[in-house]
């Protein structure tokens, strides 16, 4: 009998240990599997949109077909960040020709715009006057003409169905609705789409956009001309003018997207990074990386607490110097920024700035020599796509601040951008006493400066190594830089490269913002070096990336916005 109880007791003890072991082990091993695909990958900030891009690739579509179909979907599921009432940039890499190109479909100032048109920031953030000429659909058209394989109309069908039949409010849209609750509930056109019984929709509730579905159907059938010189044009102008805007039919008629056949590039070891130049922030990204590559970062740079603290201090100092020079950038068609860009892409110039970084301490703002002040830019969305043939697209799209101008057409369902707010105005001197940037003043037809930097990195054999970009306003450039540093230099896998807690400093204000879950070694090291740090209650930007590995294409969609990649 004793033996029997002894055996039962031993069995019970073993079972307890097994259960405890499972409880400890399961949470760490039953998370989402790594998203590694043998042939192709799509990383967007919404799972359904990644799947739509994947489906287009499986139908025999090109990497650009997949990108356009995914972007149309993102304009619904993350309508607060982007859509056909906004603009975008594509960075495209053709694996056959081994050439990179950029398509510029950024919004531009209407022809009646002028330098002093805004006397207060509210007018540049909300209402018809804040709307710049949208470029999104012209950008899709040009990209499809050059690289599309599937019929134009096919790319629209999944999003037409989503808009018409509805989809659940996701994490990103729910957060934006909560943040902008007051204005949405007070604006009938917005509340018609984004409210139920007068209150903003919650995560998981269904949103439908039947009027936008009709507009997408027209664009699918009639092409981009419907928007710019066709059946939709008069209504678009009417909607914007009735909201106080100055856009004309001629503004839409005359808008053209542009191919840039020689984007900016930088050598990173045996790899090359391609990124758009001004008015985007490619020069800023390149200057950050040029400064930092002189430190020869490696996994050892973050291996010990002391080394990690020093490494992140150096990274923040590079951010400060690069953002100081950003204040001199503008639309190169209107201002001569060639010397500024040459400096920002020069390794010699980066070496000079690196020599001014002191490992023991940071410095006051004036040390970094900011010339002017630039306004913060807003929301955006990004996708990264690689197709079976190894071609790639990085595309970043925006309507600027959450819900753009807050002007939503009750006829077409289009939500228009507030991109005029990205320009500088001579009527505003910022709170730091720094003058606004003349290079970014408003002129008719001019494009405002942006933090976007959709990037593609290829190896010495011309094969895509990494496709990366981000959304998140002024924090985009630093977040893309960190993802590249994490992947290429620190040796992190793509998921960790994207998910690793981030920090940001744009010099004005000279505050280093950190995410709340960042390693305390980093914040302690920054404080020791006299950084003014601040923990953000939110998060710093949203990154989408695809990286080539020995097992295939590893894709990561940032959990900060609830995205998920797809592939096959």
Curated annotation (Swiss-Prot):
Q: What is the protein's name according to its record?
A: Glutathione hydrolase 1 proenzyme
What is the activity regulation entry?
Activated by autocatalytic cleavage.
Task: Enumerate the subcellular locations listed in this protein's record, separating them with semicolons.
Answer: Cell membrane
Source organism of the structure: Rattus norvegicus (Rat)
**Membrane topology note:** Single-pass type II membrane protein
Which residue ranges are assigned to the Extracellular compartment in the record's topology?
27-568
Q: Which InterPro entries does its entry note?
A: GGT_CS (IPR055262), GGT_lsub_C (IPR043138), GGT_peptidase (IPR000101), GGT_ssub (IPR043137), Ntn_hydrolases_N (IPR029055)
Protein family according to the UniProt entry: Belongs to the gamma-glutamyltransferase family.
Decide whether keyword Phosphoprotein is in the record.
Answer: no
Q: Name one GO cellular component term.
A: vesicle
Any one Gene Ontology molecular-function term assigned to this protein's record: leukotriene-C(4) hydrolase
**Record PROSITE patterns:** G_GLU_TRANSPEPTIDASE (PS00462)
Give the metabolic or biological pathway.
Sulfur metabolism; glutathione metabolism; Lipid metabolism; leukotriene D4 biosynthesis
Q: Where does L-glutamate bind?
A: 106, 398-400, 419, 422, 450-451, 473
What does the organism's lineage look like at the top? Eukaryota, Metazoa, Chordata, Craniata, Vertebrata
- Tissue expression notes: Detected in adult kidney and mammary gland, and in fetal liver.
Q: Which GO terms describe its biological process?
A: amino acid metabolic process; cellular response to oxidative stress; cysteine biosynthetic process; fatty acid metabolic process; glutamate metabolic process; glutathione biosynthetic process; glutathione catabolic process; hepatoblast differentiation
Query: Which pairs of positions does the record mark as disulfide bonds?
Result: 49-73, 191-195
EC number(s): the record gives 3.4.19.13, 2.3.2.2, 3.4.19.14
Give me the gene this protein comes from: Ggt1
């Amino acid at each position: 009998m004793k033996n029997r109880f002894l055996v039962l007791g031993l069995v019970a003890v073993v079972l307890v240990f097994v259960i405890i072991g499972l409880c400890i082990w399961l949470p760490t091993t039953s998370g989402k599997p790594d998203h590694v695909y043998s042939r192709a990958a799509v990383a967007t900030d919404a799972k359904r949109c990644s799947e739509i891009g994947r489906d287009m690739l499986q139908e025999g579509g090109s990497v650009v077909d997949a990108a356009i179909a995914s972007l149309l979907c993102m304009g619904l599921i993350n309508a607060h960040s982007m859509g056909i009432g906004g603009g975008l940039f594509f960075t495209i890499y053709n694996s056959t020709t081994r050439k990179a190109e950029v398509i510029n479909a950024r919004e531009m100032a209407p022809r009646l715009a002028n330098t002093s048109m805004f006397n207060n920031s509210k007018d540049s953030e909300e209402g018809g006057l804040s709307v710049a000429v949208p470029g999104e659909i012209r950008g899709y058209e040009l990209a499809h003409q050059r690289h599309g394989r599937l019929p134009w109309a096919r790319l629209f069908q999944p999003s037409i169905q989503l808009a018409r039949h509805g989809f659940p409010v996701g994490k990103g849209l729910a957060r934006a609705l909560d943040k902008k609750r007051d204005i949405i509930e007070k604006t009938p056109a917005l509340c018609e789409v984004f409210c139920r019984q007068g209150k903003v929709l919650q995560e998981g509730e269904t949103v439908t956009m039947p009027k936008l579905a009709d507009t997408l159907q027209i664009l699918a059938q009639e092409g981009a001309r419907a928007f710019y010189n066709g059946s939709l044009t008069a209504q678009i102008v009417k909607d914007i003018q009735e909201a106080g805007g100055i856009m004309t039919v001629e503004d839409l008629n005359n808008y053209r997207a542009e191919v840039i056949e020689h984007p900016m590039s930088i050598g990173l070891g045996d790899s090359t990074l391609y990124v758009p130049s001004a008015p985007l922030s490619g020069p800023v990204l390149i200057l950050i990386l040029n400064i930092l590559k002189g430190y020869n970062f490696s996994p050892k740079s973050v291996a010990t607490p002391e080394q990690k603290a020093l490494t992140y201090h150096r990274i923040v100092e590079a951010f400060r110097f690069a953002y100081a020079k950003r204040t001199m950038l503008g639309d190169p068609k209107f201002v001569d920024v060639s010397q500024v860009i040459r400096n920002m892409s020069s390794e010699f110039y980066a070496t000079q700035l690196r020599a001014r970084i002191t490992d023991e301490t940071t410095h006051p703002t004036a040390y970094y020599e900011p010339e002017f002040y630039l306004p913060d830019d807003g929301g955006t969305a990004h996708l990264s796509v690689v197709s079976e043939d190894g071609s790639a697209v990085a595309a970043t799209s925006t309507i600027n601040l959450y819900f753009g101008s807050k002007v939503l057409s009750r006829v077409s369902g289009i939500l228009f951008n507030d991109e005029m707010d990205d320009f500088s105005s001579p009527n505003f001197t910022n709170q730091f006493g720094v003058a606004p940037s003349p290079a970014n003043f408003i002129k008719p037809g001019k494009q405002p400066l942006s933090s976007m930097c959709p990037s593609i990195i290829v190896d010495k054999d011309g094969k895509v190594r990494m496709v990366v970009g981000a959304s998140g306003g002024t924090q985009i450039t630093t977040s893309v830089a960190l993802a590249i540093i994490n992947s290429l230099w620190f040796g992190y896998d793509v998921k960790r490269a994207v998910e690793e807690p981030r920090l940001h400093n744009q010099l004005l204000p000279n505050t280093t913002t950190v995410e709340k879950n960042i390693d305390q070694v980093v914040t302690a090291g920054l404080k020791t070096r006299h950084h003014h740090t601040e923990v953000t209650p939110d998060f710093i930007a949203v990154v989408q990336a695809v990286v080539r590995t020995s097992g295939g294409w590893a894709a990561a969609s940032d959990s900060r916005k609830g995205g998920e990649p797809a592939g096959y």
